[in-house]
């Protein structure tokens, strides 16, 4: 995907922008991003909230699936997000990566990993997405 598309994705309004996710790559084979942990990412104990991990995983899976679906004239929406929290994080830069497991005509499945600055796994997940033809409304 072109640098213009990555720049476009980074300018989109919404939750991912508010969370400070910075897309690094976006192709039908891999989507990556990074973000610096801030207080807005914390839950009550001062560690990154599990919803942030779920959100970054679903965001990257959705971008990748949308690239695939877009080539077919489809839109995609999430059906299921199963994220495991492996290691607590309080601060630092996190990097996330998503890759497809299957890119079917009606559903796609993507796996994703979130790692800390030392490369240690902090969360991993799997997202199942529904591919909708243009005749369907969201």
Where are these regions (language model features)?
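Terminal targeting signals and extreme-terminal segments of soluble enzymes
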Residues: 1-138
């Amino acid at each position: 995907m072109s640098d213009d598309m990555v720049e476009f994705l980074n300018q989109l309004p919404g939750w991912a922008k508010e969370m400070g996710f910075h897309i690094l790559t976006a192709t039908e084979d891999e989507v990556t991003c990074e973000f610096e942990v801030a207080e807005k990412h914390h839950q009550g104990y001062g560690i990154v909230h599990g919803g942030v991990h779920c959100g970054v995983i679903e965001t990257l899976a959705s971008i990748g699936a949308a690239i695939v679906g877009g080539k077919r004239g489809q839109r995609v929406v999430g059906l299921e997000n199963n994220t495991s929290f492996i290691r607590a994080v309080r601060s630092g830069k996190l990097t996330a990566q998503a890759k497809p497991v299957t890119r079917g005509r009606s559903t796609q499945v993507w796996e994703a990993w979130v790692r800390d600055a030392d490369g240690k796994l902090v969360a991993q997940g799997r997202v199942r997405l529904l591919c909708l033809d243009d005749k369907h409304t969201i």
